[in-house]
Amino acid sequence: MAIDFSKYIASVQDFPNKGIVFRDITPILQNGELYRAATHELAEYAKSRNADVIVGPEARGFIVGCPVATELGLGFVPARKPHKLPREVERASYDLEYGSNSLEMHKDAIKPGQRVVLCDDLMATAGTLRASKELIENLGGKLVGAAFYIELPDLKGREKLPDVDIYSLVKYHGA
């Protein structure tokens, strides 16, 4: 029987700013059975995409992606915020509501031709996904899918990356 994960995601009004509804996944993470079930669903998706490696953007992508990689016996590649990785890196920038940020991966993190699935907690505007896709492709890999706990379809992230196969456990329309 499929789990309705939306029952376990807390909605916090006006966080971090007024007018925002923050979707909090920590109730899932705090329950071992739910965390395992969510991980398994994302792992089944990654397996269906014939992934060779899992990428997770900092920071919650680590929490989501590492157990997926472990379940599948695959490697995990962190996409880090700037100046956190010790060796030579590839960098890609993305826009935020007020400004921009960047993600970095070690230049040898993705091997040419590797099939990559990105795992993260939430897809909103797809800025992080776009930057990660750019990094993966610049390193010679192919982004074959992206898996999220939560998707906010009204922010049109899918439309910005129509060539990326996207899977999400829960979709929240509206606020």
From Swiss-Prot:
Q: What's its catalytic activity?
A: AMP + diphosphate = 5-phospho-alpha-D-ribose 1-diphosphate + adenine
Record key words, sorted: Cytoplasm, Glycosyltransferase, Purine salvage, Transferase
| Subcellular location, record wording | Cytoplasm
UniProt cross-references to PROSITE patterns, sorted A to Z: PUR_PYR_PR_TRANSFER
- Listed CDD domains: PRTases_typeI (cd06223)
The terms describing its cellular component in GO are:
cytoplasm
**Gene3D superfamilies, per the entry:** 3.40.50.2020
GO terms under biological process:
adenine salvage; AMP salvage; purine ribonucleoside salvage
Q: Which domain of life is it from?
A: Bacteria
Instruction: State its Enzyme Commission number(s).
Output: 2.4.2.7
Q: What class of enzyme is it?
A: transferase
Q: In which pathway does it act?
A: Purine metabolism; AMP biosynthesis via salvage pathway; AMP from adenine: step 1/1
Mind telling me which Pfam families this protein's record contains? Pribosyltran
GO MF annotations in UniProt: adenine binding; adenine phosphoribosyltransferase activity; AMP binding
**Similarity field:** Belongs to the purine/pyrimidine phosphoribosyltransferase family.
Q: Which HAMAP family match?
A: Aden_phosphoribosyltr
Q: What does this protein do?
A: Catalyzes a salvage reaction resulting in the formation of AMP, that is energically less costly than de novo synthesis.
Kindly state the subunit structure of this protein: Homodimer.
Name of protein = Adenine phosphoribosyltransferase
* Taxonomic source organism: Lactobacillus acidophilus (strain ATCC 700396 / NCK56 / N2 / NCFM)
Upper classification of the organism: Bacteria, Bacillati, Bacillota, Bacilli, Lactobacillales
